[in-house]
């Protein structure tokens, strides 16, 4: 099986004859916030002062090999491949060596090496990416709400950190995630960056603010290192 990556509706080998020869998936670096105390050996780390540590972008490096039948074909493939990767901006990058998850990647650099003869070349491509790998599949929890009724959902988040929720509701509701209550949510669907689901098992309390029955759908993508 040919080793390749997929971004959008194109794959490196199927569309550009570029197979992955090597890959380097780096861990993101921690965003450190430290303060030293004068005339002291102590250093204080405030990186998690808001309850969560934050991370720099992750670096991805792929070495591709392109083989062609003629020098002219090789040059065409190189140009097309370079144009493809250079246009990658916060897109989903799928690597078969990392099943069930993908990266949110942006093109950073392309370094072409000297052609190996007339029909083969090697190109090193670097991407920067969102620090976490994102699950391909959503987790979905649904509930029906009686008129002015209340129900609870036990939601499991196996991510490395709290993740944002997408909520779809047919009536005006109030959500309580663990011990934190939210403002009422109007009917419709939205992803709420400030509405974070903690890691582990969390009880979500849903209250219907209207005198008609409704339904709620909660979804999210797990994120891991």
Give the positions of each predicted feature.
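Short, solvent-exposed beta-alpha or beta-beta edge segments that form flexible loop/patches at the rim
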Residues: 24-61
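Beta-strand elements of well-folded, non-transmembrane domains
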Residues: 64-68, 111, 129-133, 210, ...
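Oligomerization/assembly interface segments of phage tail-like spikes and tubes
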Residues: 47-72, 119-132, 202
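Short beta-strand and beta-hairpin "edge-sheet" elements
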Residues: 26, 90-133
């Amino acid at each position: 099986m040919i080793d390749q990556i997929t971004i959008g509706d194109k794959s490196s080998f199927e569309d550009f004859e570029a197979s992955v020869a090597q890959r380097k998936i780096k861990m993101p670096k921690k965003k450190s916030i430290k303060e030293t105390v004068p005339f002291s050996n102590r250093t204080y780390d405030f990186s998690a002062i808001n309850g969560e540590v934050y991370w720099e972008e992750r670096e991805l490096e792929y070495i591709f090999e392109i083989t062609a039948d003629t020098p002219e074909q090789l040059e065409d493939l190189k140009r097309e491949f370079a144009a493809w990767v250079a246009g990658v901006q916060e897109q989903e990058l799928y690597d078969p060596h990392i099943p069930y998850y993908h990266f949110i990647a942006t093109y950073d650099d392309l370094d072409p090496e000297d052609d190996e003869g007339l029909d083969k070349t090697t190109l090193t491509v670097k991407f920067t990416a969102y620090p976490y790998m994102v699950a391909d599949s959503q987790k979905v929890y649904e509930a029906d709400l009686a008129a002015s009724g209340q129900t609870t959902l036990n939601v499991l988040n196996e991510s490395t950190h709290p993740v944002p929720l997408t909520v779809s509701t047919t009536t005006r509701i109030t959500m309580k995630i663990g011990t934190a209550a939210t403002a009422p949510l109007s009917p419709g669907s939205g992803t709420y960056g400030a509405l974070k689901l903690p890691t582990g098992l969390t009880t979500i309390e849903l209250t219907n603010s209207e005198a008609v029955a409704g339904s709620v759908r909660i979804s999210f993508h797990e994120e891991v290192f």
